[in-house]
Amino acid sequence: MAVGKNKRLTKGGKKGAKKKIVDPFSKKDWYDVKAPAMFNIRNLGKTLVTRTQGTKIASDGLKGRVFEVSLADLQNDEVAFRKFKLITEDVQGKNCLTNFHGMDLTRDKMCSMVKKWQTMIEAHVDVKTTDGYLLRLFCVGFTKKRNNQIRKTSYAQHQQVRQIRKKMFEIMTREVQTNDLKEVVNKLIPDSIGKDIEKACQSIYPLHDVYVRKVKMLKKPKFELGKLMELHGEGGGTGKPAGDETGAKVERADGYEPPVQESV
């Protein structure tokens, strides 16, 4: 190796030393995430997005963003095992307006329900709401001991399982087919569908822990801003002003002429 100065080191110093460190958060903005009006707590939190630069618009980066929120945070409630998915459909100012996108039970709740000495019955069905949303609902239920039962196990016969599954199909289909998405979500919040199934199946075999464990959004109708604004309780969004903004005729005295202005 030749003895001498290393030109690279003396000329430019260390490689990459001149690079200016830019804080990535300086190019981003915070947006508020708003839940639909069927939930008690509307303000979910905030989300980050890169500011509008040239053809890259900030609102386009927010649309389609999915947030998973516990029902306890949405309803200010103790029941925390149900999670709702909300998708951003439109951006108004600094607010992201969301809509229902799915529901799920937490992993620990599902694991706590599965036990020995009982039969687990599951069913799923694809149903369309009156306003054109195609949902896939998954239901789960477990058999329980009868009041006067001494035997340790409470296994249902195959025929009873089929009858219970049929009831699950019927009730889930009926509850969703006859309602729009808003009413379906209002039924999912207290899980009234699961309670109806439990009540209807008592004559076949007593059940407990009956839940709609998951809801998937399969298809959506064409996006309409008016419907989204209705979900958020902000009117129909027809584009007309809120007050009566029509002009009124002004009465003036005969021979009235406007004063001549010196400068315009």
UniProtKB/Swiss-Prot annotation:
Disulfide bond entries: none
Keywords: Cytoplasm, Nucleus, Ribonucleoprotein, Ribosomal protein
Keyword Cytoplasm: yes
InterPro entries, sorted: Ribosomal_eS1, Ribosomal_eS1_CS, Ribosomal_eS1_euk
Stretches the record annotates as Disordered: 233-264
Ranges of biased composition (kind: Basic and acidic residues): 242-255
GO molecular function terms listed in the Swiss-Prot or TrEMBL record: structural constituent of ribosome
Major location category of this protein: cytoplasm
Cited Pfam families: Ribosomal_S3Ae (PF01015)
GO biological process: ribosomal small subunit biogenesis; translation
Entry GO terms, CC: cytosol; cytosolic small ribosomal subunit; nucleolus; small-subunit processome
Compartments where found: Cytoplasm; Nucleus; Nucleus, Nucleolus
Cited function: Component of the small ribosomal subunit. The ribosome is a large ribonucleoprotein complex responsible for the synthesis of proteins in the cell. Part of the small subunit (SSU) processome, first precursor of the small eukaryotic ribosomal subunit. During the assembly of the SSU processome in the nucleolus, many ribosome biogenesis factors, an RNA chaperone and ribosomal proteins associate with the nascent pre-rRNA and work in concert to generate RNA folding, modifications, rearrangements and cleavage as well as targeted degradation of pre-ribosomal RNA by the RNA exosome.
Quaternary data: Component of the small ribosomal subunit. Mature ribosomes consist of a small (40S) and a large (60S) subunit. The 40S subunit contains about 33 different proteins and 1 molecule of RNA (18S). The 60S subunit contains about 49 different proteins and 3 molecules of RNA (28S, 5.8S and 5S). Part of the small subunit (SSU) processome, composed of more than 70 proteins and the RNA chaperone small nucleolar RNA (snoRNA) U3.
UniProt similarity note: Belongs to the eukaryotic ribosomal protein eS1 family.
Identification of the protein by name: Small ribosomal subunit protein eS1A
